[in-house]
């Protein structure tokens, strides 16, 4: 049964995991995450230099912890994997160098993993993972995309955000409302007691040059502007803002847009399976309404397990095992890191003459 030691350091979460491929599917033998949220919260967002330093401090302890829990040594792994793109370059370098060093010392293959491919693989950690073809809504702090996963043709992007990702919009609106960082959980908490219908907010659409709109694309910049104007108008009338209602109205409109366009994309492609992954996929309102409306429209909705929605190393291990199982082999030990790399070109990470 193939086993990998997987590392994740693409942003502000240091993580390590041991993942095994068994007869019943993927099994997470151990996983640990060291979050830096509290440290970055005072700055209102991630500070790259701080993130890199904390990865250096945390990663060795995390690796020791998961190996101890799994009762295994690095020498018993079939491979070592680490996220190498996209992300903060300094942060990525910590995980990549650590992974490549361990692989070289123990004579194991190294697999450089695309961060978005890892998110896509997170649904394979569910008890009953879906089978391709299906549409994936990848919705996180840095990405909002609709992706077709097909066993024959691979990955094809069908829709994307043209400005902020949904998670980034949550962070910025939370800051506008004076709520904590990260914005997703803060807005969700405030929205519980709010009226989601109190404020009318726009559903951003992206115009085609030839007329009409891109049906599966997203834009959240107009929504942010509308929230800013709403807050300014309310402050002109009173010092006390109806934070719960503002949070609920914002959360609801984002959920409406994500649900409507995702299900439409799925049905337009003649598919009956939709997968949702990424940090924002942990949002309760989004999970409930996606499943509910999916049932009403004949679409089976598969959600990444909550523990593996936000950045983690188990999903990196899942992606690496998927590549091994598909016969992609390993990455070059000379593979570096890159702040950006197309998801569709993820196979380039396994070339023996690396492009970065």
Swiss-Prot record:
Pfam families: TsaD. Its EC number is 2.3.1.234. It is an enzyme of class 2 (transferase). Gene3D superfamilies: 3.30.420.40. Its cofactor is Fe(2+). Its main location: cytoplasm. GO terms for biological process: tRNA threonylcarbamoyladenosine modification. One of its GO terms (molecular function) is iron ion binding. Fe cation binds at residues 115, 119, 311. Keywords: Acyltransferase, Cytoplasm, Iron, Metal-binding, Transferase, tRNA processing. Binds 1 Fe(2+) ion per subunit. It catalyses: L-threonylcarbamoyladenylate + adenosine(37) in tRNA = N(6)-L-threonylcarbamoyladenosine(37) in tRNA + AMP + H(+). It is found in: Cytoplasm. InterPro entries: ATPase_NBD, Gcp-like_dom, KAE1/TsaD, Peptidase_M22_CS, TsaD. Substrate binds at residues 138-142, 171, 184, 283. One of its GO terms (cellular component) is cytoplasm. SUPFAM superfamilies: Actin-like ATPase domain. NCBIfam families: gcp_kae1, T6A_TsaD_YgjD. PANTHER family: TRNA N6-ADENOSINE THREONYLCARBAMOYLTRANSFERASE (PTHR11735), TRNA N6-ADENOSINE THREONYLCARBAMOYLTRANSFERASE, MITOCHONDRIAL (PTHR11735:SF6). Belongs to the KAE1 / TsaD family. Required for the formation of a threonylcarbamoyl group on adenosine at position 37 (t(6)A37) in tRNAs that read codons beginning with adenine. Is involved in the transfer of the threonylcarbamoyl moiety of threonylcarbamoyl-AMP (TC-AMP) to the N6 group of A37, together with TsaE and TsaB. TsaD likely plays a direct catalytic role in this reaction. This is tRNA N6-adenosine threonylcarbamoyltransferase. It comes from Synechococcus sp. (strain WH7803). The lineage of its organism: Bacteria, Bacillati, Cyanobacteriota, Cyanophyceae, Synechococcales. The gene is tsaD.
């Amino acid at each position: 049964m193939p086993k990998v030691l997987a590392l994740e350091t693409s942003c502000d979460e240091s993580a390590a995991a041991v993942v095994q491929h068994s007869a019943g599917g993927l099994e997470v033998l151990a996983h640990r995450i060291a979050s830096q949220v509290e440290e970055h919260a005072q700055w209102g967002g991630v500070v790259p230099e701080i993130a890199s330093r904390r990865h250096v401090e945390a990663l060795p302890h995390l690796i020791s912890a998961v190996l101890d829990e799994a009762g295994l040594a690095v020498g018993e792994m079939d491979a070592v994997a680490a996220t190498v793109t996209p992300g903060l370059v300094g942060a990525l370098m910590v995980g990549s160098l650590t992974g490549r060093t361990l692989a070289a010392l123990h004579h194991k293959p190294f697999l450089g993993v695309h961060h978005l491919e890892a998110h896509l693989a997170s649904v394979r950690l569910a008890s009953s993972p879906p089978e391709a073809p299906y549409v994936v809504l990848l919705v996180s702090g840095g990405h909002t995309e609709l992706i077709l996963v097909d066993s024959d043709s691979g990955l094809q992007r069908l829709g994307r955000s043209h400005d902020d990702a949904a998670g980034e919009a949550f962070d910025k609106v939370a800051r506008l409302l004076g709520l904590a960082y990260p914005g997703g959980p803060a807005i969700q908490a405030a929205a519980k007691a709010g009226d989601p219908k109190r404020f009318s907010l726009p559903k951003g659409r992206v115009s085609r040059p030839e007329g009409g709109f891109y049906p599966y694309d997203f834009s959240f910049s107009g929504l942010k502007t509308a929230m800013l104007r709403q807050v300014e108008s309310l402050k002109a009338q009173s010092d006390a803002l109806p934070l719960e209602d503002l949070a609920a109205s914002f959360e609801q409109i984002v959920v409406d847009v994500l649900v409507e366009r995702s299900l439409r994309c799925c049905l337009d492609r003649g598919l009956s399976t939709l997968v949702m992954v990424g940090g924002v996929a942990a949002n309760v309102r989004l999970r409930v309404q996606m499943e509910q409306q999916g049932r009403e429209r004949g679409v089976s909705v598969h959600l990444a397990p909550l523990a593996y929605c936000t950045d983690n190393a188990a999903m990196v291990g899942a992606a690496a095992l998927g590549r091994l199982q598909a016969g992609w082999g390993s990455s070059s030990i000379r593979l570096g890191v890159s702040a950006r790399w197309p998801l569709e070109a993820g196979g380039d990470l396994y070339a023996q003459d690396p492009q970065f």
